[in-house]
Structure formats: C-alpha cells, structure tokens
Amino acid sequence: TTLGNQIFEFMSGLYPNLTEVDIEVIPTDLTEDNVFGWTLENNDQNEIEIHNNLSEKDFITTLIHELIHVDQNVRGLRDDEERENEAYSLEHTLTNQFLNKC
C-alpha cells in the first residue's frame, strides 16, 4: 500500500470519523500558496491538497495535520484558531507514533 494509505489506516484507528466521509488526496504544486497542504470540505467530501514536493517526513506530518482537520469537519469544529491549535499540538506526536509503527 502507499504511504498515504498507511497514514490513513493509522489515523482511522485513532479517529474513526475519518471512515465516515470520502477523502481524496490530491498532490499539487502549492509553492505560490506558501503552504504544505489544506483541506476543502464539500458536504461529506473532503479534498486534501498536499504539496507535491515534500520530504517523506513533511508529507507524513502534513497529511496527519490535514486528516485532523477532516475529523474536525465531521465533529463540526469550525473555529479556525481551535482547529489549528489542535492540529499543530498533535501533528508531531502522531507523526512519531506513525514512524515508530512502520
């Protein structure tokens, strides 16, 4: 399976909400946007755009961060500051947990 699928399986174990929506991961050039990734929500469709030229570790951390946002979408958490605080506070711990499982 792909790295993205492995990350999704890992995160689904912690965030069962992720299995209740459609998630599409789209590699794209986000250089001009100055971000590694973002999540767009449309009903129960969640599109994660992720920069197409990241190191493996940055890809893992970014996808984990964005999947936390998908979980927040399902939970109805809309406050941007709360959303980012939660995602940033968890991304490195979860990245290390994921890397230790591989």
For each predicted feature, which ranges?
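Hydrophobic (often cysteine-bearing) scaffold residues that line and stabilize catalytic clefts
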Residues: 3, 60, 64, 83
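Short, solvent-exposed loop/turn segments at secondary-structure junctions
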Residues: 28-31, 54-55, 68, 94-95
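Hydrophobic beta-strand residues in large extracellular and virion-surface proteins
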Residues: 11, 21-25, 48-50, 63
